[in-house]
Amino acid sequence: METGGGQGLPVLLLLLLLLRPCEVSGREAACPRPCGGRCPAEPPRCAPGVPAVLDGCGCCLVCARQRGESCSPLLPCDESGGLYCDRGPEDGGGAGICMVLEGDNCVFDGMIYRNGETFQPSCKYQCTCRDGQIGCLPRCNLGLLLPGPDCPFPRKIEVPGECCEKWVCDPRDEVLLGGFAMAAYRQEATLGIDVSDSSANCIEQTTEWSACSKSCGMGFSTRVTNRNQQCEMVKQTRLCMMRPCENEEPSDKKGKKCIQTKKSMKAVRFEYKNCTSVQTYKPRYCGLCNDGRCCTPHNTKTIQVEFRCPQGKFLKKPMMLINTCVCHGNCPQSNNAFFQPLDPMSSEAKI
């Protein structure tokens, strides 16, 4: 009996060791490497006010889960809305429910709103209190229309008897327009409206940055904002570089259809209008696909770059730096874009 028990123990340990790698590989299977091939060709269409975020694997765009919805590492909660994935006492890597983090109340126009509470200060906006700060989204879903090939001169007008304004296009085609090549891009959504000072009469509005004007080399992108003391709508510009033109060849690695993001192996200096950046940078670039998809910036930041110009002059310009890129099938039908030439001495113009 004792001998039989001694032989059974090693067999049991062997079975446990054999089962353990299976569990590990099962967890890893949830995040395949590489990501290519498992993401939908089209980006997700999320409900108004719901952002698209990268899943827990950093592979695919998914609609951020909202309060009370189920969540998991592959289906993250809307962190920008103050939500987190509550997985219960164990707090493991399984499914959970999106919950609101406890935070401070908000005061707007003499009214007190609890953290997470939603209200409408007017028919045009829906606002939410988020840990002492108020964020608003337009209910009219018009956003701010940037000039484009089909509507180079947009203008917003009021409609009698209706809350929301309406965009119309002025047929002013006598103005000379630039001929930059538009980069492949995903459609941009209008950002939320930041209302942090209840005493101000101006509700700040800012659009997303537009697509870079060039698919390779130095270009620029634009956005519209009224974030200034005069509360006036102005168009801002920033420099951008999706990739160097000498790297305009798709990846030919075996089994690799796309390279989303790649970092420069050596420090480089940016060049703009015969000016060279004072500092060196190791920027990230968007790769290319050989299956017809486009790779464009997904998450970016803006920095101030100082350039040294001829005759000892110096120039500072805002410039986009890429954090991550995404590959998708939402490619433009034409390479013609309507951009006004960029003023080398200014990054802002009134609308």
Swiss-Prot record:
Residues 201-246 form the TSP type-1 domain. PANTHER family: CCN FAMILY MEMBER 3, CONNECTIVE TISSUE GROWTH FACTOR-RELATED. Residues 1-24 form the signal peptide. Keywords: Cell junction, Cytoplasm, Disulfide bond, Gap junction, Glycoprotein, Growth factor, Proto-oncogene, Secreted, Signal. Glycans are attached at residue 274. This is CCN family member 3. GO terms for molecular function: growth factor activity; heparin binding; integrin binding. Residues 27-101 form the IGFBP N-terminal domain. Belongs to the CCN family. GO terms for biological process: cell adhesion; chondrocyte differentiation; positive regulation of cell differentiation; signal transduction. Disulfide bonds join 31-57, 35-59, 39-60, 46-63, 71-85, 77-98, 258-295, 275-309, 286-325, 289-327, 294-331. One of its GO terms (cellular component) is cytoplasm. Brain and heart, and at a lower level in muscle and intestine, in the embryo. Lung and less so in brain and spleen, in adult chicken. Pfam families: Cys_knot, IGFBP, TSP1_CCN, VWC. Immediate-early protein likely to play a role in cell growth regulation. Its overexpression is associated with tumorigenesis and expression of a N-terminal-truncated version of CCN3 gene in chicken embryonic fibroblasts (CEF) is sufficient to induce the transformation of CEF in vitro. Residues 104-170 form the VWFC domain. The lineage of its organism: Eukaryota, Metazoa, Chordata, Craniata, Vertebrata. It comes from Gallus gallus (Chicken). Residues 258-332 form the CTCK domain. It is found in: Secreted; Cytoplasm; Cell junction, Gap junction. The keyword Phosphoprotein does not apply.
